[in-house]
């Protein structure tokens, strides 16, 4: 996957020279969006400006939110069949960087066969991903097919079933002089998952497709996290803040067809559901 040059050019990194005392946190600030289609119709959309503090010692993550929007298609939701026991079909989520980067996890779990600017990720001899280095864009990208890593592709609970169709994961990092990539190098993350979803009494399986993207715009080492909480904005205020943030940092908009579908969605408060 190629990242927009504009995005890569807007990444603001504040590396520091460390002597003696080690920093306590990596601070990441950026924008995320997560949206879900049911049978090709946009049903849920969430996005926001987020700031993460990752503790370098115990790997705990602290989150501050500067503005977040929750939207859904009320017409589609009104058509959902009512069951005695209901499970929400919403699968959008907020990215949560913790532990080690995905590329480091792959180095621990799988074999990586290096070849020029491309490293192939293998599980039991099968190619399941690749790591690509781009010296022009000065980034390293890992792309992974997650399906071969699953023990099983389907699960059932309370009469509802889910069957994985595809699951792709991408992370991109700024090129580093080090021989590994930490969160201080992270600039982009994406998951793209599709699965069939149905109730045992349904005659039709819904195809659910969820895409979640995280664009990192600021990174730095810090000795302490901010004590104040995030900013809780009303929907219209959050919309203005997000649009301004995306414009300032040159972040890519959704494709025109997705933007048109968003006009059919309504704001909602998840705390009141």
Predicted regions and their residues:
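Boundary at the C-terminal end of the N-terminal hydrophobic targeting segment
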Residues: 7-9
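Surface-exposed, low-complexity/disordered segments
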Residues: 11-273
């Amino acid at each position: 996957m190629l990242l927009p040059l504009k995005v890569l050019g807007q990444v603001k990194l504040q590396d520091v020279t460390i002597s003696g005392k080690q920093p306590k946190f990596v601070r990441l600030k950026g924008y995320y969006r997560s949206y879900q289609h049911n049978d090709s119709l946009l049903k849920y959309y969430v996005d926001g400006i987020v700031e993460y503090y990752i503790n370098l010692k115990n790997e705990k993550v602290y989150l501050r939110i500067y503005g977040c929007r929750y939207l859904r298609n009320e017409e589609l939701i009104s058509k959902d069949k009512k069951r005695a026991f209901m499970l929400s079909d919403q699968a959008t989520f907020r990215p949560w960087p913790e532990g080690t980067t995905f590329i480091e996890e792959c180095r621990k779990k799988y074999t990586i066969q290096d070849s020029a600017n491309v490293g192939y990720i293998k599980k039991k001899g099968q190619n399941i991903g690749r790591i690509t280095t781009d010296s022009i864009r000065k980034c390293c990208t890992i792309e992974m097919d997650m399906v071969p890593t699953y023990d099983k592709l389907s699960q059932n609970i309370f009469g509802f079933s889910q069957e994985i169709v595809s699951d792709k994961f991408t992370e991109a990092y700024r090129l580093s002089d080090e021989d590994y990539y930490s969160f201080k190098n992270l600039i982009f993350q994406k998951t793209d998952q599709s699965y069939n979803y149905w109730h045992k009494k349904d005659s039709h399986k819904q195809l659910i497709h969820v895409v979640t993207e995280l664009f990192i715009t600021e990174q730095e080492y810090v000795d302490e996290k901010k004590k104040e909480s995030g900013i809780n904005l009303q929907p219209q205020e959050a919309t203005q803040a997000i649009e301004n943030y995306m414009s300032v940092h040159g972040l890519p908009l959704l494709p025109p067809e997705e933007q048109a579908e968003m006009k059919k969605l309504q704001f909602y408060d998840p705390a009141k559901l």
